[in-house]
Regions:
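Short helix-loop capping/hinge motifs at secondary-structure junctions, enriched
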Residues: 64-65, 138-140
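Conserved Nudix-box catalytic region and its N-terminal flanking loop in Nudix hydrolases
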Residues: 10-12, 47-50, 55-99
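Conserved hydrophobic "DFG−1" position in protein kinase catalytic cores
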Residues: 34, 58, 67, 133-134, ...
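Acidic, metal-coordinating catalytic segment for phosphate/diphosphate chemistry
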Residues: 16-55, 60-61
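Acidic pyrophosphate-coordinating catalytic loop
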Residues: 20-24, 73, 118-128
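The catalytic Nudix box helix
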Residues: 67, 81-114, 132, 144-146, ...
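Nudix hydrolase/Nudix homology domain
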Residues: 2-13, 78, 89, 114, ...
Length: 187
């Protein structure tokens, strides 16, 4: 018999208590005392993000896109990514997407398409992300934040998509964004 989607989804976890372990302006870490899905007592560590994540796939009229290169401190490696960042939970994601595209790539766009939400590391975080497609681009100069040393690369969208599919791009926001953009555009 084929796997079937349950007709209802009940939370099998029960939270008995919670304590804050760490907090800074970007994250809050809590430890929950739980009754697990198997009925046993346990603990569960959760990282709550104070911002949402977002990514922008800018596409030119001739089918090119832009990747941003930067050093990612937590991973200890250089990463090519779509323009991405975050925004305060109380702000509009499109406003933050416009800001990130201008800061990182020096671009603005006359046409924006919401390509949907996604969850990052949903086994340990509540982080939610959103992807946008930016078209009808207007070119300017990047204005990165003080702690960002960025490189900008223009290449065909399908080449960037191939990089995401074959592992040359490993950033999750970029992989999701490039896959959704190519799908949306029917390429």
């Amino acid at each position: 018999m084929a796997d079937q989607e349950p007709t209802h989804h009940l939370n099998p976890w029960h939270t008995r208590g919670s304590r804050e372990v760490y907090v800074n302006p970007w994250i809050r870490v809590r430890e929950d005392h739980v009754i697990r899905a198997d009925g046993n007592d346990g603990i569960y560590g959760v990282v709550e993000f104070q911002n949402y994540a977002l990514g922008v796939v800018p596409v030119t009229d001739d089918g090119d896109t832009f990747l941003v290169g930067q050093w990612r401190y937590p991973l200890g490696l250089y990463s090519w990514e779509i323009p991405e960042g975050g925004g305060p939970l109380h702000s509009l994601p499109l406003d933050s997407a416009r800001r990130e595209l201008a800061e990182e790539a020096g671009l603005s766009a006359a046409s924006w398409t919401d390509l949907g939400l996604f969850h990052l590391s949903n086994s340990v975080t509540n982080e939610v992300g959103q992807i946008f497609l930016a078209q009808d681009l207007i070119f300017g100069e990047p204005t990165p934040e003080g702690d960002e040393v960025l490189a900008l690369r223009r290449l065909p969208l399908l080449e960037a998509h191939a990089m995401a599919m074959d592992g040359r791009i490993t950033d999750g926001v970029s992989i999701i964004g490039l896959a959704r953009a190519v799908h949306f555009l029917g390429l």
